[in-house]
Every structure is written in structure tokens, then in C-alpha cells.
Amino acid sequence: STKRSNLETESNSLNSKLITLRANLSNYKEEGTTIEEDIRDMKAEISRLTAKGCKNNEEISTCGRKYNSGNVTITATGWSYPLNWGCVTSEYTGYNIREDWSGGGGHHGIDLDCVSEGTTAYPAANGVVARIVNYSSCGGNQVWVYHNVNGIPYTTVYLHLLRISVSVDQVVTPQTKIGEVGGYSTQSYDNCTTGAHLHFGMAYGHNAYNFNANSFNPRNIINFPALYYSGGGYFSR
């Protein structure tokens, strides 16, 4: 079937990436999900969409758009900050002083700080929750949201959450509580954080399972202030 063929292709690609990542593990640590988590969640997604009515001859992306959020088309015309207030302490692809990277590595988002643990995090635009990961070793509790802003599909991700307040397929707005910012109390399982902050990332398309390859600097779309440690100020909704 088309779905099974897609899954096998993705699994082969992810397994190949796993070999490469393990070979270079001493050089960097990738923030987000592990390859094993991606494969596990993709299989669960196939089962979930099949149970909702996706047919064997349908593309995963097509039937996903059809059945996610109860056939409701979620659109938006603009973006909001994912926190009511905060500052930027780490740039997209920049070295992150709050995360443990052995020798560096890519940073596929920006870090929003100057807030305390437990601060409410919000979606950056109207959308639907596409994926949730709990207790990942490098990213902790994570939420992916699919958007369609001005006719363009996007994915946003929110990492290092203390708690998650939404569920997969839930329709959200910029006023919906996604969860709470994590911090020192999440370090027991999240090896990539040393303090309270929200990692916020953006990518083109609906790519909860291939996010980093399609990611871009959130500053390209949302007007965040300069780095706090370089004299930048605060943002607020």
C-alpha cells in the first residue's frame, strides 16, 4: 500500500540517519527527538490515521490534512509571540549557552528566556496540534503544531516544557495554553536544558517528522528583539 511504502521509505531514511548520527555522536548532540522516537511516532501516526478512515491508496500527508482536527481547515493571517513576555538568549543555529552540546551542533530554533519555570506557553498562530513527545532525552516534553498562515503551511515546535496542556488533533489559537515552560526540575530526563526557557522553532510545510531539514530562523517572520546578552530588550504580546 502507499502508506506502507511511505513508512518503509521514511524508516530506511531514518535508520540511515541514525547510523550517521551515532558515528558522529562525539561531535554533537541534536536537539529534539531521537530517530527511535521518530520511527515509533510515525508508526503510531499510521495506525491513528488508518483508524480515522485513511485508505491504503492515500498519501499520508493528504489523508492527514483530511482527518486531522475533524475536517476543519485551520487558517491564520498573522503570528504572535509564544510567550506573553520574554527575551531571546540563543539564536537559530547559534551556540546555546543553556544546552549541553559536546563540540557544538545545530540549533534549529531560538531560545526564549527571562521567564520563570511554569510560565504559560502559547501557539504562535491558529493551528492544530500534530505531535506530542514526552520525556525526550534532548528536548524533554515537546509539542508540534501545524499552521496555514496566509495560504502557506508551517510547523512550529515548543521544547523543554514542564507540562503539556493540549492533545494531538486539538485545534488551537494564540490564546490556547500549550503547556508550561520547563527548567531545572526537568533536567532529570532532559539532558539539553540547564534552566527555564522555551525553545521555539519554525519550519516550512507540515513536517513534524522532518522538522530540522525544513526549519528556518523564526526572526524571518516574527519580530523578536536582539539577543538579551547583547543589549537586546524584551518582547511582549
Describe the function of each predicted region.
Residues V128, I152, Q170-V171, T176:
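Residue-level signal for well-ordered, solvent-exposed loop/turn and beta-edge residues enriched
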Residues V72-W79, N84, S167-P174, E180, ...:
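Acidic, glycine-rich catalytic/binding loops that coordinate metals and/or anionic ligands
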Residues D113, Y146-N148, A203-G205:
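A generic structural motif
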Residues G105-H107, S116, P123-S165, Y184-L198:
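Zn2+-dependent peptidoglycan hydrolase active-site motif and core
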Residues S1-N71:
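Alpha-helical oligomerization segments with coiled-coil/rod-like character
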Residues D111, W144, V157, E180, ...:
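Conserved beta-strand positions that form and line the central face of beta-propeller blades
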Residues C54-N141, P174, Y229-R237:
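Surface-exposed, glycine-biased beta-strand/turn segments
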